[in-house]
């Protein structure tokens, strides 16, 4: 499969399903094949992303996996938008910690015009101070909002599909899968890179994981965060699937084969789901989060960098001009 991917011949759905479910496909040769594709496009470099949850809670949506959803009973700290000083300080720390990209995440259905103006100002300030790429995740966009963010210098917009179209109604009822697709398409039309991924382990079928990989390929997603579900006490979706490290690694390999030149990230839940096999994620994936997620903790940057280097990889940074 590596030879086919390197030649531009991408796998079909049946081949993808076999990668996830066929015990006759041994894990280590699969990871080695995925690494050949990863190495061709990214070498041994690893891009570290650091999130800043700039607004937490107060969300109108009912995504049942999310601790911030309107019907969640999770005991999270709710706060409106952080001060400019806090957000800029987060960017400075991200850069000094070795981050390739600083990702600002704001809860809510869609940012109003004043919020877009505010975020655009912050994006310009960050880009003027530090050589770091900037990603924003703030809900649904229309053409005008996407265009303003692009003009401000935003590199990438994140809006996760999270699961397949046919399963989406099982995890959310306040908006549709089509709403998410529309935002990704508007971001692309504005010239923004698209970041979109999945949460694995919410009760979906293997076929639906393959479907998401295929959809992201059609959207030309440049960044794919592969999250592994972690139940937060009080969230409406309980503990659903017990993922094994081997299954999680197979999923990362799947996304690499289906999206050979995309940035594939071992994202939320990697620590608790990959466990002792965490460093093996670097064979298919070329990107990691550090310093935690939205409402769950993760490894600090120093520990993440050490894991990367111990595994024979290196942290990739943007060169200063």
Curated annotation (Swiss-Prot):
[2Fe-2S] cluster binds at residues 103, 135, 195, 265. GO terms for biological process: biotin biosynthetic process. Binds 1 [4Fe-4S] cluster. The cluster is coordinated with 3 cysteines and an exchangeable S-adenosyl-L-methionine. Binds 1 [2Fe-2S] cluster. The cluster is coordinated with 3 cysteines and 1 arginine. Keywords: 2Fe-2S, 4Fe-4S, Biotin biosynthesis, Iron, Iron-sulfur, Metal-binding, S-adenosyl-L-methionine, Transferase. Its cofactor is [4Fe-4S] cluster; [2Fe-2S] cluster. It comes from the Bacteria. Pathway: Cofactor biosynthesis; biotin biosynthesis; biotin from 7,8-diaminononanoate: step 2/2. It catalyses: (4R,5S)-dethiobiotin + (sulfur carrier)-SH + 2 reduced [2Fe-2S]-[ferredoxin] + 2 S-adenosyl-L-methionine = (sulfur carrier)-H + biotin + 2 5'-deoxyadenosine + 2 L-methionine + 2 oxidized [2Fe-2S]-[ferredoxin]. Its EC number is 2.8.1.6. [4Fe-4S] cluster binds at residues 59, 63, 66. Transmembrane segments: none annotated. Residues 44-270 form the Radical SAM core domain. Disulfide bonds: none annotated. InterPro entries: Aldolase_TIM, BATS_dom, Biotin_synth/BioAB, Biotin_synthase, Elp3/MiaA/NifB-like_rSAM, rSAM. GO terms for molecular function: 2 iron, 2 sulfur cluster binding; 4 iron, 4 sulfur cluster binding; biotin synthase activity; iron ion binding. NCBIfam families: bioB. Catalyzes the conversion of dethiobiotin (DTB) to biotin by the insertion of a sulfur atom into dethiobiotin via a radical-based mechanism. Belongs to the radical SAM superfamily. Biotin synthase family. Homodimer. This is Biotin synthase. It comes from Magnetococcus marinus (strain ATCC BAA-1437 / JCM 17883 / MC-1). The gene is bioB.
